[in-house]
């Protein structure tokens, strides 16, 4: 037999134990207990303000709820294995503490608007924490970029060396992605910050409640204008999962690059012992577990987004039990995003070191300065397309003779086109190749310094 639930008087027989277990959410929605208590305190105060319960009853309810909060924080709150959900567990314990007045707490409220309120309060809190983590991650990237303005790194397209870059420019690309993530979560927060409390099961209530007052107590900016929408809306959860997915897209892309950079084939970075592991059979190995796990965990959050979209697409108004499935997706996504941000921040600040000499060698041993040869001829009046075609022949000639562009003699250059002169060597030197790209947003050192300062100013403003 299972203990009677708040709704069980309608039924003649007890719920089958296996179905009770299947139906229960207490195993995961206990995550919401602090928010459930906060929402209930606000609801109790609203009931007093509107005269629905007496001040003495309201005081008893609030004191009882705060007692439960303290019990939970001290590890003394036991919801019981038979509790269907956290709402029932709290109400049962409240009635034990406050007596029959505890049964008045649910006046003018349904579990439908209650759980919607709890989950939004939870997510508001988590969004703020994640945004703080994003700023910490950005700060580490900015510090790295500051130290590597004049460090060169090969730039790639199609994973083929394309043009050399300032390493700071490369890192600042991720700063920009992180800033969009920070902004995007702020926009999601605005949608989450709407109170459904008082919407009831779906149609509102006959009690003279004050929804705006309870919303104000809970820090919501507004209330839902339609009770059906208030209890059935999960757009905000989908938006959060979408924003979380994009955060992890960016972390996963960086992780992929770090994995490449740490390989012997690239050798651009060295992994420190604090953020890498070894092999159980191959003693020479130092494995990039952190970026590999971030890359793998990204798929979890993608799955939660897809799962909630599929869950919602066929639901009629208003509340359906299917919506219970949104909690675990949200909880796991929050923990995954926070864990990945923390791990990547530690990895960038303590777990890897760039190898400037190896990076310089990589930039010097390829044809990533070929575009600059074409640009050189274009500045001499040669049409760019003609210059482009000529440089293709130059590269082919170098490949056939086993040379790099810098190895060609001036006579060889002139034999290819009379406009070539001794200044070609300066034009194709890696530092000059990078420095010359001073268009707005480019990798030129002056542009990078300016972009770095702008990004840091923006970062500092975001923390105020």
From Swiss-Prot:
It comes from the Bacteria. Strongly inhibited by L-arginine. Inhibitory effects are lowered at pH 7.0 compared to those at pH 8.0. At 37 degrees Celsius and pH 7.5, activity decreases to 73% and 31% in the presence of 1 mM and 10 mM arginine, respectively. Activity also decreases to 84%, 93%, 82% and 85% in the presence of 10 mM sodium citrate, citrulline, asparatate and glutamate, respectively. Activity decreases to 96% in presence of 1 mM L-lysine. GO terms for biological process: arginine biosynthetic process via ornithine; L-arginine biosynthetic process. Gene3D superfamilies: Fumarase/aspartase (C-terminal domain), Fumarase/aspartase (Central domain), Fumarase/aspartase (N-terminal domain). It is found in: Cytoplasm. The keyword Glycoprotein does not apply. Keywords: Amino-acid biosynthesis, Arginine biosynthesis, Cytoplasm, Lyase. Its main location: cytoplasm. Catalyzes the last step of arginine biosynthesis, the conversion of argininosuccinate into L-arginine and fumarate. Belongs to the lyase 1 family. Argininosuccinate lyase subfamily. This is Argininosuccinate lyase. The gene is argH.
């Amino acid at each position: 037999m299972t203990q009677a639930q708040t709704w069980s008087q309608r039924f003649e027989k007890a719920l089958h134990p296996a179905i009770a277990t299947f139906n229960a959410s207490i195993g995961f929605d206990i995550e919401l207990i602090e928010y459930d208590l906060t929402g209930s305190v606000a609801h109790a105060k609203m009931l007093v303000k509107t005269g629905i319960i007496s001040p003495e009853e309201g005081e008893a309810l609030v004191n009882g709820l705060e007692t439960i909060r303290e019990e939970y924080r001290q590890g003394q709150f036991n919801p019981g294995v038979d509790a269907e959900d956290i709402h029932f567990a709290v109400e049962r314990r409240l009635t034990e503490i406050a007596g029959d007045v505890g049964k008045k707490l649910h006046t003018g409220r349904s579990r439908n608007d209650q759980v919607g309120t709890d989950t939004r309060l939870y997510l508001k809190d988590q969004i703020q924490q994640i945004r703080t983590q994003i700023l910490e991650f950005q700060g580490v990237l900015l510090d790295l970029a500051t130290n590597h303005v004049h460090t060169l790194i090969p730039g790639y397209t199609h994973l083929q060396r394309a043009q050399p870059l300032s390493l700071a420019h490369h890192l600042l690309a991720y700063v920009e992605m992180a800033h969009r993530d920070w902004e995007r979560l702020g926009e999601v927060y605005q949608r989450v910050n709407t109170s459904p409390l008082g919407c009831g099961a779906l149609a509102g209530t006959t009690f003279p409640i004050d929804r705006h007052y309870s919303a104000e107590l809970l820090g919501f900016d507004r209330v839902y204008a339609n009770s059906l929408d208030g209890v059935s809306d999960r757009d905000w959860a989908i938006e959060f999962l979408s924003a979380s997915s994009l955060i992890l897209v960016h972390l996963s892309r960086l992780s992929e690059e770090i994995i490449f950079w740490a390989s012997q084939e690239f050798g651009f970075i060295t992994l420190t012992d604090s953020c890498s592991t070894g092999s159980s059979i191959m003693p020479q190995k130092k494995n990039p577990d952190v970026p590999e796990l971030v890359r793998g965990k990204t798929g979890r959050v993608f799955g939660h987004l897809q799962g909630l979209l599929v869950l919602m697409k066929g639901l009629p108004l208003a509340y359906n039990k299917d919506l219970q499935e949104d909690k675990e997706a949200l909880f796991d996504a929050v923990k995954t995003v926070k864990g990945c941000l923390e791990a990547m921040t530690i990895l960038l600040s303590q777990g890897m070191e760039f190898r400037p000499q190896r990076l310089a060698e990589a930039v010097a041993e390829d044809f990533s300065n070929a575009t600059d040869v074409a640009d050189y001829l274009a500045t001499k009046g040669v049409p760019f397309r003609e210059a482009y075609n000529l440089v293709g022949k130059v590269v082919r000639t170098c490949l056939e003779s086993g040379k790099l562009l810098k190895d060609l003699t001036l006579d060889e250059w002139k034999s290819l086109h009379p406009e070539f002169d001794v200044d070609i060597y300066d034009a194709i030197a890696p530092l000059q190749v990078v420095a010359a790209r001073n268009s707005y947003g480019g990798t030129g050192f002056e542009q990078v310094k300016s972009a770095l300062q702008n990004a840091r100013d923006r970062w500092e403003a975001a923390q105020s």
